[in-house]
């Protein structure tokens, strides 16, 4: 099963606004070459780094859960997964390192209910909590979270 990650309206606004601000900054610095190049380099680095983590879809295969990201996929074998269930990360959760809306939510977060996790999600209302046997946790999202959880749990029961 494969399901796309959709960005919430908040993420779309943050992404659009930040890109517009970067463009305005670059245009306004066109008379100062050193500032212009510094802002261009920072913009390229920010966007490239963000695209590396930006989640595009989630897929279950016979052997693993694949988190498709724009530039590189994250593969988690079912043998590493202990459980999958729905969750809603709190809006008051602490972002330790990552993005809180630009091209989705990605990075390390700490939530009072969930605990510390690495997030790859676009919409807080479509989240899945993936717990690994080693104690790590991932929060991912997709358009069909209930069906995705069912698919993951089916594969987990097959791999016991």
Sequence positions of predicted segments:
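N-terminal membrane-targeting/pre-transmembrane regions
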Residues: 1-32, 132-137
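A structural detector for beta-sheet-dominated domains
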Residues: 8, 61, 68, 79, ...
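Non-transmembrane, membrane-adjacent beta-strand/coil modules in membrane-associated proteins
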Residues: 68-134
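A signal for specific C-terminal beta-sheet/loop modules enriched in small/flexible residues
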Residues: 1-10, 74-93, 147-160
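Conserved beta-hairpin
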Residues: 44-85
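A membrane-cytosol interface segment of integral membrane proteins
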Residues: 3, 112-160
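Charged, low-complexity, helix/coiled-coil-prone segments
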Residues: 21-28, 41-45, 88-100
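Short, aromatic-rich membrane-interface segments at the entry and exit
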Residues: 32-40
């Amino acid at each position: 099963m494969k399901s796309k990650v959709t960005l919430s309206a908040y993420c779309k606004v943050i992404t659009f606004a930040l890109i517009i601000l970067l463009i305005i900054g670059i245009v306004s610095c066109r008379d100062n070459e050193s500032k212009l190049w510094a802002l261009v380099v920072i913009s390229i680095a920010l966007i490239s780094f963000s695209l590396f983590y930006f989640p595009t879809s989630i897929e279950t295969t016979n052997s693993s859960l694949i988190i498709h990201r724009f530039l590189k996929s994250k593969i988690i074998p079912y043998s590493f997964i202990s459980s999958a269930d729905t969750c809603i990360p709190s809006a008051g959760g602490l972002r330790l390192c990552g993005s809180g809306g630009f091209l989705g939510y990605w990075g390390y977060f700490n939530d009072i209910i969930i605990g510390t996790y690495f997030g790859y999600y676009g919409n807080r209302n479509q989240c899945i909590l993936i717990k690994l046997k080693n104690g790590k946790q991932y929060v991912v999202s997709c358009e069909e979270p209930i069906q995705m959880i069912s698919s993951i749990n089916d594969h987990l029961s097959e791999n016991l």
